[in-house]
């Protein structure tokens, strides 16, 4: 069996931290032939879909062979693991991968869902599980909401890994000017969400496979910051899921399955859903290190069962 990973250039990956590296290594341990390419390596000539890909020896990390042009139908599964931003190149790649899916190839996550699920806006499908939230472009509406909530977090809809998050008081001087900046003079919507003080104790990244939680890690912000993302200096800690968090997972599960979102990372703060990460969820390495479980192997095993 062959699997293809569509992701950032391999030389950019830090194997000790990267979930894609963990998945490739687990696939290799399962006797799967692992190949890799970037979105720019995908192509279609008529109805012939292919990728200029390299064979990967993922463990020990990493060696590659010579690039070859291979039909996408040669792969039992294609993982779309390119990190955001979800820009034009990313979107075009999902269109090509959707053609492969129509040709019978399993593509994870489903390309149409990757286009449809903005990682901030997707959570609004479950707004009953979230903190009070407003998405808007009008400064007057955003400012009124911020004053109502007293303290909020501004979230650019295209941000990732904590980039661009701003904590601000509703009564802060210059609030309107800040909102003008983040909305590009009311040309772009932004998410404004009630600030949850419990985030200082951390948020939970929960990894779901086919709708079921397989692992979780608590991410505690560094001193003086409220952003718990590991890329922003957050510290990973072992954790267990409580009944509320299991309830959130259970409510998401049927929708994630129906949408073809096989591998997803959700963020939960104080029992409230914050984000649903579908592009290239991280956290495998941290769960494996803190809990001593072979999480990546479990993900690949679930995939092999689903492939039959």
Curated annotation (Swiss-Prot):
Keywords: ATP-binding, Glutathione biosynthesis, Ligase, Magnesium, Manganese, Metal-binding, Nucleotide-binding. It is an enzyme of class 6 (ligase). Its EC number is 6.3.2.3. Binds 1 Mg(2+) or Mn(2+) ion per subunit. It catalyses: gamma-L-glutamyl-L-cysteine + glycine + ATP = glutathione + ADP + phosphate + H(+). Its cofactor is Mg(2+); Mn(2+). InterPro entries: ATP-grasp, ATP_grasp_subdomain_1, Glut_synth_pro, GSHS_ATP-bd, GSHS_N, PreATP-grasp_dom_sf. ATP binds at residues 146-202. SUPFAM superfamilies: Glutathione synthetase ATP-binding domain-like, PreATP-grasp domain. It comes from the Bacteria. GO terms for cellular component: cytoplasm. GO terms for molecular function: ATP binding; glutathione synthase activity; metal ion binding. Pathway: Sulfur metabolism; glutathione biosynthesis; glutathione from L-cysteine and L-glutamate: step 2/2. Residues 120-304 form the ATP-grasp domain. Mg(2+) binds at residues 275, 277. Belongs to the prokaryotic GSH synthase family. This is Glutathione synthetase. The gene is gshB.
């Amino acid at each position: 069996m062959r699997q293809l990973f569509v992701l950032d250039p391999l030389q950019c990956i830090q194997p000790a931290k990267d979930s894609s590296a963990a998945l490739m290594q687990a696939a290799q341990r399962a006797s799967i032939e692992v190949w890799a390419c970037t979105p720019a390596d995908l192509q279609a000539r008529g109805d012939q879909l292919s990728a200029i890909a390299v064979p990967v020896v993922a463990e020990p990390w990493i060696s590659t062979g010579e690039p070859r042009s291979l039909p996408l139908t040669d792969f039992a599964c294609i993982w779309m693991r390119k990190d955001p931003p979800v820009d034009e190149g990313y979107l075009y790649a999902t269109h090509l991968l959707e053609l492969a899916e129509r040709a019978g190839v399993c593509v994870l996550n489903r390309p149409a869902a990757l286009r449809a699920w903005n990682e901030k806006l997707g959570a609004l499908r479950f707004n009953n599980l979230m903190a009070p939230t407003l998405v808007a472009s009008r400064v007057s509406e955003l400012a009124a909401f911020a004053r109502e909530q007293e303290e909020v977090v501004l979230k650019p809809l295209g941000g990732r890994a904590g980039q661009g998050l701003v904590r601000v008081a509703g009564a802060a001087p210059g609030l309107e000017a800040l909102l003008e900046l983040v909305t590009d003079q009311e040309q772009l919507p932004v998410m404004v969400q009630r600030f949850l003080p419990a985030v200082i104790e951390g948020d939970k990244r929960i990894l779901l496979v086919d709708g079921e939680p397989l692992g979780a890690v608590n991410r505690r912000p560094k001193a003086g910051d409220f952003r718990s993302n590991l890329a922003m200096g957050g510290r990973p800690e072992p954790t267990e899921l409580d009944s509320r968090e299991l309830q959130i997972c259970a409510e998401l599960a049927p929708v994630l399955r129906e949408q073809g979102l096989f591998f997803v990372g959700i963020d939960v703060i104080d029992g409230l859903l914050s984000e649903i990460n579908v592009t290239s969820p991280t956290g495998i390495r941290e769960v494996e290190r803190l809990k001593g479980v072979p999480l990546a192997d479990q993900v690949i095993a679930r995939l092999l069962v689903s492939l039959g």
